[in-house]
Amino acid sequence: MSEWSNFTTIVRGKGMWLFDDHGTKYLDGVASMWCNVWGHSRRELVNTIIKQTKKLQHSPLFNFTNEPSEILSKKLIGICPGMSSVFFTDNGSTAMEVSIKIALQYWKNIGLENKTKIATLENGYHGDTFGAMSVGYVPEFFSKFKSKLFQTIQFKVPNSYHLPKNMTIKEFEDKCIERIENRF
């Protein structure tokens, strides 16, 4: 795969910056694929990670639990009205897979097992598993797998950056909602 052979080697990060092996500085504008939104090398995070790894580095949540997961669960339930439980997974692709499974199982549980259509936004990258590629289809990344992905109902991203000149933002929002409603 020759197109993958000449990548820049990142050797460290500080705050919102990444540095390569030649000392060149890059703005980490996607928070290292949305996984490092607090910045690189923040002392309080490093210290917290060190403290936690001295107690427990990892434990499965399959028929087990652990103190940090329980603490976070209680905090999330406390700030999310109507939520009574949470489900943790270890990456975004798996989160998408589980979300799809939960949605399909919900409809089956209430007797509407024929409700299987999933609505998505165009170019909404969600990961690299087949389910995540299906709901987050980005042609540049996944076109070689398109025939293997399940179908979704795709909508254009309602981005006011491309606001038609003859519309107000409110009119544009209403038009985007109308497009969705008309598909169902």
Question: Which residues fall in each region the model found?
Answer:
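A generic secondary-structure signal marking the coil-to-beta-strand transition
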Residues: N6, K14-G15, K25, S85, ...
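Electropositive phosphate-/nucleotide-binding environments in soluble metabolic enzymes
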Residues: T8-R12, G39, R43, N66, ...
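A generic fold-level signal
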Residues: I10-G13, E113, S147
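Conserved beta-strand and immediately adjacent loop positions that scaffold enzyme active sites
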Residues: G15-W17, S85, K117, I169
